[in-house]
Amino acid sequence: MQIFVKTLTGKTITLEVESSDTIDNVKSKIQDKEGIPPDQQRLIFAGKQLEDGRTLSDYNIQKESTLHLVLRSRGGMQIFVKTLTGKTITLEVESSDTIDNVKSKIQDKEGIPPDQQRLIFAGKQLEDGRTLSDYNIQKESTLHLVLRLRGGMQIFVKTLTGKTITLEVESSDTIDNVKSKIQDKEGIPPDQQRLIFAGKQLEDGRTLSDYNIQKESTLHLVLRLRGGF
């Protein structure tokens, strides 16, 4: 089958693969086409970094799926983290560091537990499993640190197939944020998701608290067919 690999420069590479191919195999094919050594390649699908020993079918990668290729840069860089008190912290990081890693570095410097940290860049809240390069955070970028006063909560999302997904959210999360979290877990694009709670379809710009969605509430996920109404 054919799959596509999109690079950060926007170039798209087409590969011939089989479902049983491992991620290592795919990286070798990319090396054959593009000359990039496998150890410098990170492949992302549905917000997840793909592990070398696993196969395409393990990740439910099907024909004409698009993977994203991020290069692991050698050597580190400095970034800045600005707190609400106006203090600026300097961190030594690598592009391949995850947001969790960055929060741990902040904990080492400032003693703030990672679960109380929210990091913002370009107006977006950064998610733990993603990397700095996923968000195009480069040397000398400035992140903003906001403290989570109350912890988050769990909610459930039930699909039409009967599967239930558990999400970590905050009352202040917008419906868009929730759809992004579902995309990270399930690979379903937000524009194909409709979320229903208490018989109402939820609108993107509104928050969970707007709809009185509390901990352990269950939302229902309905898929929008392409070309539908």
Swiss-Prot record:
Pfam families assigned to the protein according to its UniProt record, in alphabetical order: ubiquitin
Swiss-Prot/TrEMBL keywords: Cytoplasm, Isopeptide bond, Nucleus, Repeat, Ubl conjugation
Subcellular location per the Swiss-Prot or TrEMBL entry: Cytoplasm; Nucleus
Main location: cytoplasm
Lineage: superkingdom: Eukaryota
SMART domains, A to Z: UBQ (SM00213)
SUPFAM superfamilies assigned to the protein according to its UniProt record, in alphabetical order: Ubiquitin-like (SSF54236)
Note: Ubiquitin is encoded by several different genes. UBI3 is a polyprotein with one copy of ubiquitin fused to ribosomal protein eS31. UBI1 is a polyprotein containing 3 exact head to tail repeats of ubiquitin. For the sake of clarity sequence features are annotated only for the first chain, and are not repeated for each of the following chains.
Protein name from the UniProt record: Polyubiquitin
Species, as recorded: Candida albicans (Yeast)
